[in-house]
């Protein structure tokens, strides 16, 4: 059976990581995968995470199932960090996910199950896995202009012009902050305009939030997201805890639905 499978192409980021590890130069700098490193090149466990693990080790008395949606207490606390009381708790649904990628996948499966999804609009450029997951799920996609390489900023006029072509029941995928790969973010005023366009077009906003706290701070980084979810009827948010909690290998994330 398996002899008929074709070998998958190697991951370019993983190839780059291997090359970096083999490089003997002392002045090398790793600009590959998005992992925090200190001055010594190590990725330490945060003190708060280590303390939490110690408490869990001491007090946890069961490994029994917690239900299909995972730890609701954990998910609600992450929701509080992300949403800052911008929407009524009654409008929120949560599910623990295996990282931000798992949350993204779960929410796209949920949207696909409605059988009413049109195109999913992703920025050009965007995180490569966005396109890969959409293709794997058989969901149609369109792209919108985002980054101006001359000014190194968002070209909002071109972005807005492209998004004017969205149709009812399309999904607009936005980066919550620290846009990957450009680092260029929408201003709060631009979030307001995009929110109005979402309302006018009756499309579903989908926020990929992987870097909260790495831009202008935990609260500032989600101001635009908070405004948006407060002013739309429905939204989806995929949250990654890999970066801001430094728990990359533990695959920690949350899928949030606002309805």
Language-model segments: which ranges?
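Short catalytic/ligand-binding loop motif for oxyanion handling, primarily in non-cytosolic enzymes
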Residues: 37-41, 181-182, 246-247
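Conserved core of the PLP fold type I
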Residues: 55, 61-200, 213-214, 222-230
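Short beta-strand segments
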Residues: 32, 175, 239
């Amino acid at each position: 059976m398996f002899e008929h499978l074709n070998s998958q192409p190697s991951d370019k980021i993983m190839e780059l990581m291997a090359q970096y590890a083999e490089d003997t130069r002392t002045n090398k700098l790793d600009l590959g995968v998005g992992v925090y490193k200190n001055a010594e090149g190590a990725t330490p466990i945060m003190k708060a995470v280590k303390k939490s693990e110690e408490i869990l080790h001491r007090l946890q008395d069961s490994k029994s199932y917690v239900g299909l949606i995972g730890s609701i207490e954990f998910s609600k606390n992450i929701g509080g960090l992300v949403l800052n009381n911008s929407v009524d708790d009654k409008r929120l649904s949560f599910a623990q996910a295996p990282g931000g990628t798992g949350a993204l996948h779960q929410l796209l499966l949920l949207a696909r199950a409605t059988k009413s999804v049109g195109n999913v609009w992703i920025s050009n450029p965007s995180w490569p896995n966005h396109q890969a997951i959409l293709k794997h799920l058989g969901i149609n996609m369109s792209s919108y202009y985002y980054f101006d390489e001359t000014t190194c900023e968002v070209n909002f006029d071109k972005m807005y012009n492209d998004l004017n072509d969205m149709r009812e029941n399309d999904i607009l995928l936005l980066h919550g902050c620290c846009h990957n790969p450009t680092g260029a973010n929408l201003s709060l005023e631009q979030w307001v305009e995009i929110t109005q366009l979402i309302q006018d077009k009756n499309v579903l906003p989908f926020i990929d939030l992987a870097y909260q706290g790495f831009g202008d701070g935990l609260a500032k980084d989600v101001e635009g997201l908070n405004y948006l979810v407060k002013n739309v009827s429905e939204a989806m948010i995929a949250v990654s805890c890999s970066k801001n909690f430094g728990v990359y290998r533990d695959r920690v994330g949350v899928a949030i639905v606002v309805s």
